[in-house]
């Protein structure tokens, strides 16, 4: 029996899946490597990123010995979730705020913007020309696009929406100094360039991406429980009020994350 031809909206969906699952990790790895080399590569006791066990352990140590990033594996095996953790959520790249407290790039530059759920950054370029802010916004834009795909309740994307997603992606890539040529190539693919074998690969890869995403959210829930216990202990011990306030803010941020990121009942998690 002959297979039914793809509708344009279905083709757009698989193009976007291909961009997110194949091109996002490449862009994020390039960005992470650049961030590492610029911040640590020249420091005594560190080295430029060569993906060796030694340099991955350096990153682990810079994270305080604990991270959700699988540093036991080559960074070529890190998925989008791990790469977001290794960049905008990493302690390694934290910067001081106006009060001198070190915050992750996400806490410092993304959260203050208070984006509505389901929306995107209007611009990923820092208004003040701050490279760290630009990187944070561009990486977060890719995170928002990836999350949107995981939340999708349909395996179809209309042309106008697809064009918007592609433009957001290209803007983020340009801000990160990543070439956009592959995005243009995928965006121009025809149905004949999507053989059934490739569709099956994308479907399986989407399942794995969604599984990793859900595992991350489960980890966030576990972190919330740990923070709740720590916050209680600090209050009992009459800890410094500023420390308690910062911990309470972190607890509230984590508590809000699952409600914003958890896929809905009709989300396309298995295709």
Regions inferred by a protein language model and the residue ranges of each:
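Extended alpha-helical heptad-repeat/coiled-coil "stalk" and oligomerization rods
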Residues: 192-270
């Amino acid at each position: 029996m002959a297979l039914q031809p793809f509708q344009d909206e279905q083709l757009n969906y698989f193009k976007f899946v291909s961009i997110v699952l194949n091109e996002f990790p490449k862009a994020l790895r390039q960005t992470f490597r650049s961030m590492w080399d610029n911040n640590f590569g020249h420091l005594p006791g560190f080295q430029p990123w060569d993906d060796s066990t030694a340099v991955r352990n350096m990153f682990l140590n810079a994270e305080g010995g604990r991270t959700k990033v699988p540093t036991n594996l080559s960074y070529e095996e890190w998925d989008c979730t791990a790469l977001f953790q290794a960049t905008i959520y990493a302690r390694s790249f934290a910067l001081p705020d106006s009060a001198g407290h070190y915050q992750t790039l996400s806490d410092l530059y993304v959260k203050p913007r208070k984006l509505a759920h389901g929306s995107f950054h209007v611009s990923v370029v820092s208004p003040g020309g701050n490279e760290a802010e630009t990187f944070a916004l561009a990486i977060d834009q890719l995170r928002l696009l990836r999350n949107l795909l995981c939340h999708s309740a349909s395996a179809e994307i209309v042309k106008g929406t697809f064009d918007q997603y592609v433009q957001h992606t290209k803007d983020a890539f340009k801000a990160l100094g990543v070439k956009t040529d592959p995005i243009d190539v995928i965006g121009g693919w025809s149905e004949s360039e999507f053989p059934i074998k490739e569709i099956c690969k994308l479907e399986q890869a989407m399942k794995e991406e969604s599984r990793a995403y859900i595992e991350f959210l489960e980890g966030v829930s576990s972190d919330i429980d740990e923070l709740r216990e720590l916050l209680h202990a600090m209050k009992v011990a009459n800890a410094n009020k500023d420390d308690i306030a910062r911990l309470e803010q972190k607890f509230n941020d984590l508590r809000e994350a699952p409600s914003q990121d958890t896929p809905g009942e009709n989300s396309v998690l298995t295709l």
